[in-house]
């Protein structure tokens, strides 16, 4: 605050676990805590498995990027201000509408492994030669081509998103 009083154009960026104020502001903040509290860990993993944490410093890295971007925007504005980035809010942003949906409906998206509820099939698959491929079919036209390559292009169960979702495990 003293620095801002001396230089009204100053942009200060603060990065913390839970923000500068509020009930958790004084608590230690670590990426693992934010990943658990945001629901990311609960959402990650196989349907019948335990919650999983990301195998990289995802929260730290993404929060750093968000803070850097917000700082650049603040500098571009020419108006002095404090940029307050924190680990938990950054993870809530990554969770997209899932947090709001849970708050409104009480429904939690189930763990789908590498799958997404709106893209079927999606995942990594071992080929007959032992190598791996990554597949994501976010539209019916892409799914039709993938199903054709797999030899099930004429199977009506996989023609529509609804059909592919109903037969996700096949």
Located regions from the model:
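Active-site-adjacent "lid/gating" segments in soluble enzymes
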Residues: 2-133, 137
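Aromatic-enriched alpha-helical interface/lid elements that frame and gate functional surfaces
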Residues: 121-170
